[in-house]
Amino acid sequence: MGIRIFQVDSFTANPFAGNPAGVCLLPDPRDERWMQNVAREMNLSETAFLVPLPDGFGLRWFTPAVEVSLCGHATLASAHVLWEEGLLEPSETARFHTLSGLLTATLRGDCMEMNFPAKREQPAEPPADLLRALAVKPVYIGRNDLDYLLQVDSEETVRTLAPDFALLRSAPVRGVIVTAKSESPGFDFVSRFFAPAVGIDEDPVTGSAHCCLGPFWKERLGKDEMRAYQASARGGVVQVRVEGERVILGGRAVTVLRGELLV
């Protein structure tokens, strides 16, 4: 019997938008090499692997190149699959044991909410190659344990960035967030996320980046709840609520593929 696997578009209500993630439902744990090979075969920004535990699910995330310690859109996709496939009741909380600790998700109508750790940034001096790769003059530069964050002067600057990914790959971090205050109705801020160092030139919609963006924009906008747009080619909407050292990320998802792994 094959292993059930899904492709889910996260942070969108429409197929072919948002960020696609693979979700693999494992009856038993598999070794890292096998999971990495599956992620490479799926060739999505992340593939999630779920294993049932007595008090929830073990959850690991792999890009086509490496395992990562935190991934928002693949967590949203995982929760979506558990509810849609009837593995959890709508009233049940999804509990995920991960490299970033216990993460939870709840269903609120047609929207899912995930409880993630805040990833606050501190002012930082970036490598010269990073600024050359982006060819921008940021108004602020910060860094946390995962990424650099660069605030730029306008939404247009965010949308028109054309990074040199070969140069950007040398940055000693998972990725680079570029953000600005939104000039579009209905959104508080916009961003893009680049992570060539882990095999993803540009991630379409990045939940984990909003664990940094939420606290960052809360301080500047004076708001606990915000609506964010990630301005990639596919685009996606993230609801963000900051609660102390936790960030609640909200969004929708749609399954576009169901299948079986035969290996």
Summary of predicted features, one role per range:
Residues 1-70, 76-263:
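Active-site proximal loop and beta-alpha junction motif in alpha/beta enzyme cores
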